[in-house]
Amino acid sequence: MKKQLNVLISGGGTGGHIFPALSIANGIKERRPDANILFVGAENRMEMEKLPAAGYKIVGLPVSGFDRKHLLRNVKVVARLLKSMHLAKKILRDFKPDIAIGVGGYASGPMLKEAQKKGIPTLIQEQNSYAGVTNKLLAQKANAICVAYEGMERFFPADKILVTGNPVRQNILNCTLTPQQARQKFGLDPDRRTILVVGGSLGARTVNNCIAAALDT
């Protein structure tokens, strides 16, 4: 009889972190239905709503990102980080994960750092072609680093890199709509050229606004 697999997945703050994390969790569940998965995110961020809605348990840390424009505000950020590291230790004691997976974002920093101190195997998943600060800091002691693009040796130890591509949700992979059906679904004119604009993370709004403004001129 297999020992129950305890998997801790940490990260979040934006959809760019949350949805790959959700895809990883779903993939683990497909292969190991008995797996016990716990998410750790940042308090008051979107993961605290999205992941329970998908049927997963999540714990929030009071962690936040550093303010690079207003340095004095970082006093509170450091205090939150220290508190988060203390809470991370308790989470590890209570949950006893077999592996800790970090997908980037505020919460994965203290969570994976504490896991590494305890000798728990850690895996990092980097979605972008330019690595985030948190993942770069965790890379040296990570057991494996899954990336979406070639050439990530400039950020991470080459011997730890696995080029896996980005995790994709199964409902997207299962989509069978034809281009014509997709245009109809979104109310687009099938006789006009269709342009898809995809922005990443919180910068998507700026990209969308620029494109919309350009189309109006």
What residues fall within each predicted segment?
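Conserved nucleotide-sugar phosphate-binding/catalytic loop shared by glycosyltransferases and other
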Residues: 4-12, 30-80, 85
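Cofactor-binding loop segments of dinucleotide-utilizing enzymes, especially the Rossmann-like FAD-
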Residues: 12, 42-44, 63, 127, ...
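Short amphipathic alpha-helix
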Residues: 17-28
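Donor-nucleotide binding loops and adjacent catalytic segments primarily
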Residues: 45-46, 50-54, 177-184, 188-217
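Active-site-proximal region of nucleotide-activated glycan assembly enzymes
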Residues: 57, 116-180, 188-190
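Glycosyltransferases and closely related glycan-assembly transferases
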Residues: 87-101, 107-123, 136-144
